[in-house]
Amino acid sequence: ITGSCGLVGSEAVNFFSKKGFDVVGIDNNLRKFFFGNEGSTTKIKNNLIKNNKRFKHYDIDIRNFNSLEKIYKKYKKNISLIIHCAAQPSHDYGKNFPILDFNVNASGTLNLLELTKKYCAESPFIFMSTNKVYGDNPNKLNFIENKTRWEIKKNNKYYNGIDERFSIDNCTHSF
């Protein structure tokens, strides 16, 4: 699980550890770099290690192909699933530093895909993303305003969630 100390990644670690799986987590606490000490995921990492005996953490940047390859070589065919949650998390930072943003989000992902193909091609690769990829298109859905929340009508094809068929074309993004 990449981004294993982030919001979604840490939940995946807890879920699969509690199901009895051995979980390898990769996270380099990039949030601290972007957001300072208040963005650090060190406490989350320490809690994951303390509470999940089947969890092994590696402090690796997904842009570092050689470091990632060491992990893939170590676990090889024991890798039964890859959940990719790692990303450059700051949209404002991405606007100001687009090359770094691209290197983490695109090149890092490509590293993982290539290594998965080489060492465990039969294993599913789940790529997590952000709602930001949809830009303003979700705002065009026909919502119902309730007392405490907005909902989509039950007969809407996206009632149970938005999947990969939802268009990201011709929409505004973070900048």
Model regions and ranges:
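N-terminal Rossmann-like NAD(P)+-binding domain of SDR-like oxidoreductases, especially those catalyzing
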Residues: 1-175
